[in-house]
Amino acid sequence: NGSGTSTILGVAKAAAAAKAKGMGSKRSILFMLVSGEEKGLLGSKYYVNHPLFPLENAVANINVDMVGRIDQKYTGNPNYVYVIGADRLSTELHKINEAANDKYSNLILDYTYNDENDPNRFYYRSDHYNFAKKGIPAVFFFNGTHADYHMISDTVEKINFEKMEKIGRLIFHTVWELANRDKRIEVDVTAGE
């Protein structure tokens, strides 16, 4: 997940730069990279069971996994990202992400994989899910699968860096809004709704 990792590091760098200019966020932001996803979400599972900070203090989890490629559905149009889970626990998280997109990125936010009936079940297959199981609102940003998915042929020269930057901008502004709101977002959706 080089594209997701790089994007997270870019968002962290932007947050640190804002803080250095005296414009830091109201809330702390924990940037975390975990491993073991393909073996059963092991890194995130370990963290939620052994957190460095009390989980009740977590406002949201933002998961960035594979955001630099283009899937078959969007061949010729890299201006999209699949958004999964933002509305599963908090309607506010969903609205914040959409508002950030409208203002800063103008991407197509595709909710295909957010559908409970989607056979891929991506919502349950990436690291945000361990946080969601603990009642922490989560959103997963994803570019979809491609011919090199889980292959050694998935190499850096195939990354669309302009697309990745736009997604990173969306993620930064979503995170920044979450970290600077007067009140925490509310968990207002129950499982199965």
Annotate the PLM regions.
Residues A18-G24, L107-D115, R181-T190:
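Surface-exposed patches in mature extracellular/periplasmic domains of secreted proteins
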Residues G10-A20, N49-F53, E98-N106, A132-I136, ...:
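Sec-exported extracytoplasmic/periplasmic mature domains
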Residues T7, V11-M23, S44, V48, ...:
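C-terminal soluble interaction/assembly domains
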Residues G2-S6, M23, E38-L42, D87-T91, ...:
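Soluble non-cytosolic domains of exported or imported proteins
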Residues S6, K13, F142, H146-E193:
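His/Asp/Glu-rich mid-to-C-terminal helical/loop segments that flank catalytic regions of hydrolases
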Residues G4, S25-L30, V64-M66, A100-K103, ...:
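Active/binding-pocket-proximal capping segment
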Residues N1-G40, I171:
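Alpha-helical metal-binding/catalytic segments enriched in His/Glu/Asp
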Residues V34-F140:
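Metal-dependent peptidase/peptidase-like ectodomains
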